[in-house]
Amino acid sequence: MALLFLFLTATSFARKPNVIMIFTDDQGSIDAGCYGADDLDTPGLDKLAQRGVRFTQFYAASAVCSPSRAGLLTGRYPIRAGLIGNAGSQKGGKGGLDPDQITMAETFKAAGYATAHIGKWHLGYNTNMMPRAQGFDHSFGHMGGCIDNFSHFFYWSGPNIHDLWRNETEIFEDGKYFPDLMVEEATAFMTLNKEKPFFIYFAMNAPHYPYQGDVKWRERYKDLPYPRNLYNAFVSALDQRIGKLIREVDRLGLRNQTIIAFQSDHGHSVESRAHHGGGNNGPYRGHKFTLWEGGIRVPAIISWPGHLPRNEVRDQMLHGCDWLPTFAELASIPLIENDIDGKSMTQVIEDPDAPSPHEYLRWDMSGQWAIRKGDWKLLGNPKASIDGPALEAADKKLFLVNLAEDIAESTNLAGTKTNIVAELKALRN
């Protein structure tokens, strides 16, 4: 802890570090080379892990897009942030993050940071819920849940709508690849603000459907089974842009002054628009829209060369709400809102033997819920997954598993471990 204390003490007197939060969309539990995907090229993420700390028991705040983002930006469980389902994807639609919630951007802005949202928003498509009303000085990207990466239209059930904005102005970049536009926008923002600390929320619309990897990546994976070939091409395309973004930080001479963190918002999709799959959840059961491990256990990394450990792995139980208090502690800035559920990860980052900062974690999502305490996990009203055994009537109500003994969540112990069930259920109150 002495090393971390020196870093934090120095930070309080020196210029505050820049922070870039990279948030990918529908990236599966092990969909990176550094997480064991041997059929996938991700040199950008692999290098980030080599220059930082990689987490193996990191949980998204939800198994669906908007609530996961709400948890990230507020440090609160989505149910306490007031958003447990997706926000609308058409202008003026219902749902979104309440403007009264204090966001990560507002916290950084109050500490003198320049703040930018670049990429996907999906936290409200009304003026009072869009990024510039939530603490971001600058915003570039789409407000809805996804777009075509070349036309920048939201294609769903109609009407199809164009969705690309710079601040409150609709812009048109027809035919230009959205991940490239994101890197260009981030580079311009960093260049403009390189003399002061900045915070960038870099929220990628990948590998969320539509699967639109570059030609070179489609060629690279053409012999893989469908739809893994399409999915991998898009993951490698996003990784290529992450690598480019980090090289731009290096080029500007800012790497040792910049904390870069990465997380997927939840597990991979098996929706029809996603070709019914393509992602890899490894040994875990489940996927997006489920609270099995494959829906919420996600890849996550933090890197700050010269300040945090390099090429190390942490196995403690952590959560997407933890980024806000962690960044605040590392940057020595005060939290505006202290009534949050996230806990600082700094002790875990520094010490592989430090305990998890959480006694337990909880999830609430459209009727489903889950509690994890230690190795025990209780799911309430679990949704069937395409990769697990069929759920019996009792399983559909309560499903208890010991993750240390059954990482695939295949055997329900709720009927025999009633004392554990009662203990975990009580934590929801």
Specify the residue positions occupied by each region the protein language model found.
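Formylglycine-dependent sulfatase
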Residues: T11-F399, E405-L427
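Bacterial N-terminal signal peptides
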Residues: M1-T9
